Amino acid sequence: TPYWIFFFFSGLAMAQWLLAEPHHVKDKVVLDFGAGSGVVAIAAKMAGAKRVICCDIDPISLESCRENALLNNVELEYSDDLYKSEQVDVLLAADVLYDQCNRFFLDEFLKFAAEVWVADSRVKNFSHHKYMKIDERSATTWPDLDEAKEFKNVSFYKTL
């Protein structure tokens, strides 16, 4: 079962945050890294982003993003390779640090956007000189998988 079929804590929290605080993406070009089913990308577009690119290496994930964009009547763009992506105004990444091997992306993101937002429920505080923890929010995976309470707090990080 692909992970992205669920609305995990961080993606849900980031989508809610974008809809509540649309000024972070309004009129900007946004890339949603590890887009999964497109929840964060769709929220960014609904929040007023000029363009939103769903980036995921899984072709079935990108197809899911396409279907969900149609269901939500939003226009998105799609990429299966971060390294073929253009420079964007904002890069969003939710639920991508669950594997410590993915931490190198924190540096890679900076090659594509000066403003990067990371939301993660598994990493409570990572030490990186280019990022700062700025917020913490509660969320529940949907459907509720009865996961440990420790994962229900999502940490938000932003580039300095």
Residue ranges of model-derived segments:
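S-adenosylmethionine-dependent methyltransferases
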Residues: 1-160
